[in-house]
Amino acid sequence: MQHRIAERFRRGRLFLAGEAAHAYSPATGQGMNAAIQDAANLGWKLAFAAAQPGGSAILLASYDHERRPVARQVLAMTHLAFWGEASTGRLPALMRGTLAPLAAPLLPALMSRRHLVAAGIRLLSQLPVSYRGSPLSVEGTPQARGGPRAGDRLPDKIVRSAGRTIRLHELLARPGVHVLLERDADWPDDLAAGPMINVHRLTSAPAAA
């Protein structure tokens, strides 16, 4: 069993994604998730750069900055999981042969805790992935307290915009860059011009998902 990761995910006009960029052990089944996230991250940036050639250098460079650290984290997690499941070493053998049977009676109680199950699902689905260290992730001033920060995955909430009630992820499904404005936020009309720039004014605070 082997795992590997490319030294870089981009060189000039060449980009690596999916198993061309990284290969993991099958433990926890992360390969497809990572490949889809690579494609989603890179796809819109290529489309935007094609529509707006000027100033796209930082945008395209951000792909390697964002996805390669995530690939390293996933590699470490899958390696640890495979080590625990299959290694013939003394410690993993002790964990499987002695500690796991002792802990097995606790499993039903743990599985009944919805927050624990939800946290496990989020982890395996790679939903907590964050790009806070990306050159594209710039915090506002003053920095907002609580909630997602620049580079975090945006939660899916129910909002009102342009007279309709809609889920936030559905509102943002259109390709391009999206600007979310509060009801009374100032926004010059001329800044809304340009291809792949979408401006949404939220007329109510996000409700619980």
Indicate residue ranges for each PLM-predicted region.
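FAD/FMN-dependent oxidoreductases across multiple families
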Residues: 1-30, 34, 55-57, 70, ...
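Functional cores that coordinate and move charged inorganic groups
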Residues: 32-46, 50
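Helical substrate-recognition/capping region of FAD-dependent monooxygenase/halogenase enzymes
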Residues: 48-209
